[in-house]
Every structure is written in structure tokens, then in C-alpha cells.
Amino acid sequence: MFYRENGQFKTSYRADQQIFPIRQDRIVMLLLLAVAFIAVPALASDYFLRAILIPFLILALAAVGLNILVGYCGQISLGTGAFMAVGAYAAWNFGVRFPGMPLLAQILLGGCFATLVGVIFGIPSLRIRGLYLAVATLAAQFFVDWAFLRIPFFTNYSSSGNVSVPQLTAFGLPVQSALEKYLFVLILVVVFTLLAKNLVRGAIGRQWMAIRDMDVAAAVIGIRPMYAKLSAFAVSSFIVGVAGALWGYIHLGSWEPLAFDLARSFQLLFMVIIGGLGSILGSFFGAAFIVLVPVALTNIPHMLGMSLSVDTAAHVEHMVFGALIVFFLIAEPHGLARLWSIGKEKLRIWPFPH
């Protein structure tokens, strides 16, 4: 009853091609942005910002990048953690070797280097697909881990391999407190999400989806598979690299290569599967789920008067993730985003059954 587009007429192609063509969607999005930019800074504690919201935003951005490659272009990747590591270490090296370089420039250049590495390891996608491509991208994970552990140049000859970021400033403003870091990350996530949304709605996005559905047929109608696949790897790696730089600079502050290990790659893949393949919104759903489930598994036993050790809670977390992945692959392959779409369709006809 409240979610209907009755009387909302479009008089131009531009109006019909809006990201949110229905007025109710625009209102909801504006309300969410108002909550994120106004209510959260006013009400959220430092712990909530540092432990939940900042990791959620950064992981959601990384999931958006991975979803472009896996969900929209159909090229499976198990090297996302490696591309995050390249973005983080490249940004850190620019900051160390070029003192005075702006923080935003460091992060964007880190994304550019992640793009280069992603395209190099995306070249096998021109000849192989499926599990073979997954193994090829898995090689990127092992190679990058080895490089950052064994080549001291990347860590500025640190004996432990651990690197730390100095005091952060952006555009002359400090980025030190939890609130300042949250707002900095939020602005970047909103900008890159809008860019990703417009890309997948444009010509290049349609090429990615054509390659995903049937690359031979896409080539027959004039789409160049090499350009489409490598562009998907480039865009995905850039966004993931930016997310990796944010993860190191904003969330961790000090890290080592194990912060971007294979477990991180699988975690991001789980986000995309649970949230919904081929859905930008699903990336946020998946990230929220992955971030909140450990919190729930930690707090619910205490609320019930039970006590779980750290190891037991970690095992339960993995069991829940595995069970949910199997559930979504069988019952709803399009994930939480599809359930959200079904809910909106029900609202359109409520209170009528059909």
C-alpha cells in the first residue's frame, strides 16, 4: 500500500534511467544517508564505530569490488585478500617514500597498483574458467603473501614485516578519532558505491553480464571477451585495493601480511554469496551479516547464561557460515538481496495476495 509507483510517470529517458526510479526508494535512501551522516555520529559510541561500523563499511566496499568480478562478470576469484594487501602496502610505501603525499592520493595509488596486479593475474581468465580460474587466482594469494614476507623492500626493511601508519590527515583535517575515521570511510564508500552502481548499469556492465551468461554468444554479437574480462578484473581490483588501503590505514593502523591471508579472501567470497551475486546492495547485506554474526555469537550465549570459549565461538562461527552458504546455494542462490526484492514485491500488492 505504501510502496507503489502509482501516479509516478516518467516524461524523459533520463528520469526513467535513474538509479532509484521509484520515489519511495529515493526517500528510503535519503533517510539512510541522513542516519549514517547525522544520527550515527551523534549517537554511536567509539567502540561501536571502531569495532562494527568501520569494519562493516570497508568490508562492504571490498565485497562490492569482488561482486563486480564474480557476480556481474562471472569470473570466480580466490585472490581478493591478495589484492587488498597490494592496495594496503602500495599506499603505505607511497606514504613512506614520498613524505607529504596526501592521504587520499596514497589510497588511490594503492588501488592503482592493485589494479595492475589484478589485471596480470586476470590474464588466465582469457583461456580458462570455473575452478581452473579459481586456482589461478589462488596462486595470486600465495604469491603476494610470499612477496610481502620475503622481499624486505615492500616493508621498508622492517625486521618483523610489521608496518605502521603515522598520524593521518586529509585535506588539512585530522583523521584520528573514531568519528573522524568513520566519516572519512563513509564518504569514500558512498562515492565508490555510486561509481560501481553506475558502471554495472552502463554499457560495460551489460558486457560483463553478457560474458557471465554466455561468453561465446557475447563474442558473436560483437563483445570482446578480452576487454570485458580484463576490465572487470581491473575495476574489481581497484575497488578492492582501495578497501585494502582503508583496512590497513583506518581500521588496523599497524599490520603484517597475515592480515590479508587466504581466510580474508574466503570471508569476502562468503559475503558475496550470502548477500547476493550480481547485486551491489547484496554486498552490503553480506558484509553486515559477516560482521554481525560473530557479535551475536559472542553475546547470545552470555544472555542465555552460557559460556563459550574463544575457540568454540570461532568454530561455531565457521559452522554457521558454512551452513548458511549451503542454504543460500540451494534455497536462494541470489542471497539476501533476492529476499529483499521479494519483500518489496509483496509490499507493492499488500494487502492483496496477488
Tell where the protein language model's regions lie, with residue ranges.
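Transmembrane alpha-helices and adjacent helix-loop boundaries
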Residues: 1-354
